[in-house]
Structures are given as structure tokens and as C-alpha cells.
Amino acid sequence: GAAVSAPVVGALKAACGNVPQFTLAFNICTLSALFAVRPLAGAAPADPATAISAMEWICSPLVGISQIFVVNDAISGALILGAIGMYSPMCAAHTLLGSCIGVGTGLALGAPAAELGMGLWGFNPALTALSVSVFFVPGMPSYALATGGAAATAALFGGAKVAMGTALGVPALTLP
């Protein structure tokens, strides 16, 4: 994957100029491989009635942060958040806020509780809010952008998850 992504990053840099690419090269390379095997083709949708415990609800934003690195664990999420906080407490606050907003948006949109508990609705909004905290001057406009961006990213993830998983048989990854 990494050997293939380097030339993709180079091509995207030439095509995008100074516009940040974030995870686009990763998505292009990974989805190219996943389209070949279509891991979700024919998979049954998650059961929306699956209940999760109160502790899983409380930990779901931290699990969402751990999912940035494809880990499904609240302790790992807390460690990642702590590392981000050592760099910048503001970045850590935005990351946690984004993941919380993702969980809340998923809940409002009727996402299966199991998906929320596994952090699947938290990692993209966490990345969105973190990006805003890095590229924008702190203040009410940037907080509003981080909040709105995290909610929009979660909503887009919900739609992309269904469309890509059902129609194409691949996960949405970090596309939204």
C-alpha cells in the first residue's frame, strides 16, 4: 500500500496544488484493492436493535478516536487523545468534540447502536474537527465550523456507508 500511495500522492500534489489532500491518496489506493475483493458484497446490514451498555455509550467517542488508526478500543482512543493533547490541548478538544458530535449525529439519524459503540460514526467527524483546529485561527467561527463540519461529515458517512456498502460492496473509509 505505501509503495503505491507515494506516486498517487505525487500525482495528487501536481493536480491539487496547495489544496490539502488529507487521506485522498489512502482512499484511492485502498479502495482500488477493496474493489477487487468487495468484502461487503452480500453482507447483512447491522441489526439496529442491538443494544449496547451505558459504559459503551460513554466510551464510544474514545473508540471513535481509536478507529482513526483502525483500533476498536476506548483505552487506545484515550491514549491517542492524550498524545494529541500533549501536542495541542486545543487540537485534542476539537478531536473529542468531533467524535462526540459524530456519535450524536449517528444517534439522531438512527444508526445501529453497535456501529456507534464501535466508533464507526466518530472517526471521520473527529478528523474533520481536528483539521479545522489545525488550519483555522481559534475563535467562534472556527468552533462553529468544526461543529458543523463534524455533523456534516457524520451525515455524509451515514449515506456513503449505505451506498458504498450496499451498491459497491466496499466500506466508505475516510471519504466523507
Where are the regions a protein language model picked out?
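C-terminal transmembrane helix-loop-helix hairpin of multi-pass membrane proteins
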Residues: G1-G77, M90-P176
